[in-house]
């Protein structure tokens, strides 16, 4: 099975645009070493993904907890999307295995 297919199976999601998935896995160190091949880093997708994750999490919490005040919702969202929480999720999915990193 192709590496991206394995990742999709782990995620429980099939990406329509495999190129976007692949681009999301290019670390800036890899992109710098392969710039001549048209490879760009995942930083722009990371920016967009952070915004989408924040929105989806906020929408979920807003619907799930209609009686919580804004401050509580903000604190819960911050805890869910913080670097430590996302690191735990990434480790549980072994995402590092799929990243393309540079040599240096």
Predicted regions mapped to residue ranges:
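RNase III-family endoribonuclease catalytic core
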Residues: 1-104
């Amino acid at each position: 099975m192709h590496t991206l297919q394995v990742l999709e199976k782990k995620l429980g999601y099939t990406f329509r645009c495999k190129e976007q998935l692949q681009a999301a896995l290019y670390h800036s160190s890899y992109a710098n070493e392969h710039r001549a091949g048209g490879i760009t880093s995942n930083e722009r997708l990371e920016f967009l993904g952070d915004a989408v994750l924040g929105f989806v999490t906020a929408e979920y919490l807003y619907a799930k907890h209609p009686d919580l005040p804004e401050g509580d919702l903000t604190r819960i969202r911050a805890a869910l999307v913080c670097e430590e929480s996302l690191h735990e999720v990434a480790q549980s999915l072994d995402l590092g295995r799929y990243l393309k990193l540079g040599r240096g």
